[in-house]
Amino acid sequence: MKAVVFAYHNIGCAAVRSLLEAGVEIAAVFTHVDDSNENVFFESVAKLAARNGIPVFAPEDVNHPLWVEKIRQMQPDSIFSFYYRHMLSQEILDIAPKGGFNLHGSLLPNYRGRAPINWVLVNGETETGMTLHTMTVKPDAGAIVAQEALAITDADTAATLHSRMTHLAGELLNKVIPQIVAGTHSLTEQDTTKASYFGRRTPADGEIKWANDSRTIFNLIRAVTEPFPGAFSYLGERRVTIWGATASEKTYDVTPGTIVETKPLTVACAQGSIVLHSGQAENGLYLSGDQLAAEMYLVEGMRFGPQASAVIAATRRQKVLIMGANGFIGNHLTKRLLDDGKYEIYAMDMSSSQIEQHLSHPDFHFVEGDITIHNEWIEYHIKKCDIVLPLVAIATPIEYTRNPLRVFELDFEENLKIVRACVKYDKRIIFPSTSEVYGMCTDEEFDEDTSPLITGPINRQRWIYSTSKQLLDRVIWAYGKKDNLKFTLFRPFNWMGPRLDSLNSARVGSSRAITQLILNLVEGTPIKLIDGGEQKRCFTDISEAIEALFRVIENKDGLCDGQIINIGSPDNEASIKVMAETLVEKFEEHPLRDQFPPFAGYNLVESQSFYGDGYQDVQHRRPSIKNAKKLLNWEPTIMMDQTIEDTLDFFLKTAVEETK
């Protein structure tokens, strides 16, 4: 049998040896270039392959068509993956007639995902094992070929368990590889109801929470000890890594984290205590617990805990700079941040009509100004604040053809200055991209990470807005890669609600669709349906959209860093015509209905006559919100009818007030 192997780490080496011992012809080994930032404590798959005369490769993207074709030319019967760190595409899996097989370090379906050896120790499991399973595009989900269990003892650490699992991998494969070669192996589907999934671990996950019980802390320490970065805690600003410890049931009536003895060095937990056997001060030597206490001058009553500066930073209210605070997104976001009470807002806009109620708030500092003029004020406040939201843009479709250069100057050039200032002062920017960047994409749902961004020809000037935003997205992404700019791009999909533009802006034709339609009802003029209103959009309630944006600002666990997030409601898809009909229905039922003229009907209008030359429309715009679900734990629930009702109510009451 001929195989192509994807392998890394000690377990990868053990697996390659098992294949060779079984007489499998290995056409090539794909592995990884060792990361200089990683503690490379493990054996080299590349060296093992080279010593056995096996061609070895380490491509950046093994799923690239060039590599797929190269693998196809090798004509493997089977594909094996042994602790290879990248997913293989379906194209690669389809090459091998006998299929693909992956070795996973747990008893599947438990502990699918990353770092299972560390996770089972963290969670205090008493058993783990090795599983060989068929490969599917979904990670660790294929049918089980063979499985061996392994008991976990209190003496196990990440190092010892990894060594034992490496040995187990060899034993398992020595039994099952001959069966695969002979075609006599069996398959058992996984019970998905018992599946659990765990993500990657980072060094930051090793911070000790002393409010846990001693057993939980002991499990963390042994799960991330050498050769991994280690569990750690702080004494003020002094970081201490704890390499070895035991759990004691003895409980002390003190605050968790308090040093209660120095010989042996003992720290109180919420329940029980931890006896430290070995540790290391930052930039210090690996020492016994007792010597560590002596050399760091530790005494009873001192307390381990979070880094002092981090505690201060966590309690300090973050400063947020909002440019365009009087706009639709800006005024709703301002209210949400002030209601939370953890943010201090600095804001600029050319008017304060929508935020007057906040002007006296002690945490709201507003300046009336123009971002094209007040460059020094803006740069000073970017330097002063923690988070920057540049919400100033021309975002009404008629302006794209009426004033294309003005759209470019404001939406791109002025915002580029802000982006560069964020790079200069190392500030986090949350940038409003737009659903318009997807243009005429034909995907059923627009995906932030995979959907193509397709715009029309140059003579269709309506695309200048989309292109300006897309280019800024690309510039921000490049700054993130090159200069470590902290950023999140969010893409609104037809956010709708009270204070979306104004009736006055609708009177001059510079508003979004629903506000324009409400003006028609208020003034008794026909509702204009551009090209019959057949274009479909996914309407999103502003309250839910702002909640998603608020969670982006919160950025729990840094999950939003470097991400693009669609914020929209895919289940609220409707044509402009249906939206208009719903609006008219709500209008006729409204308590203020008798204050306004009779409904004047619908007027079907060609887009060119309404928008002018250079316009081109999009027939559907439906977002994928997988990133919002995963990163923000956000999913919209408010239906379009309710949003239309709330929006209409606001503008009708506003119109009545204006006539008094």
From Swiss-Prot:
Residues annotated to bind NAD(+): D349, D370, I371
Binding site for (6R)-10-formyltetrahydrofolate: R114, T136, V137, K138, P139, D140
Pfam families hit by this protein: Epimerase, Formyl_trans_C, Formyl_trans_N
Annotated region (Dehydrogenase ArnADH), positions in chain: 316-660
InterPro entries registered for this protein in UniProt: Arna-like_SDR_e, Bifun_polymyxin_resist_ArnA, Epimerase_deHydtase, Formyl_trans_C, Formyl_transf_N, Formyl_transf_N_sf, Formyl_transferase-like_C_sf, Lipid_A_modif_metabolic_enz
Enzyme Commission number(s): 2.1.2.13, 1.1.1.305
Keyword annotations of the record: Antibiotic resistance, Lipid A biosynthesis, Lipid biosynthesis, Lipid metabolism, Lipopolysaccharide biosynthesis, Multifunctional enzyme, NAD, Oxidoreductase, Transferase
UniProt record similarity statement: In the N-terminal section; belongs to the Fmt family. UDP-L-Ara4N formyltransferase subfamily. In the C-terminal section; belongs to the NAD(P)-dependent epimerase/dehydratase family. UDP-glucuronic acid decarboxylase subfamily.
Function: Bifunctional enzyme that catalyzes the oxidative decarboxylation of UDP-glucuronic acid (UDP-GlcUA) to UDP-4-keto-arabinose (UDP-Ara4O) and the addition of a formyl group to UDP-4-amino-4-deoxy-L-arabinose (UDP-L-Ara4N) to form UDP-L-4-formamido-arabinose (UDP-L-Ara4FN). The modified arabinose is attached to lipid A and is required for resistance to polymyxin and cationic antimicrobial peptides.
Descriptive protein name: Bifunctional polymyxin resistance protein ArnA
Site (Raises pKa of active site His): D140
Record's GO cellular component terms: membrane
GO MF term list: carboxy-lyase activity; UDP-4-amino-4-deoxy-L-arabinose formyltransferase activity; UDP-glucuronate dehydrogenase activity
GO biological process: lipid A biosynthetic process; lipopolysaccharide biosynthetic process; response to antibiotic
Membrane-traversing stretches: none
Signal peptide: none
Binding site for UDP-alpha-D-glucuronate: 395, 400, 434-435, 462, 494, 528-537, 615
Subunit structure: Homohexamer, formed by a dimer of trimers.
SUPFAM superfamilies: FMT C-terminal domain-like, Formyltransferase, NAD(P)-binding Rossmann-fold domains
Positions of region (Formyltransferase ArnAFT): 1-304
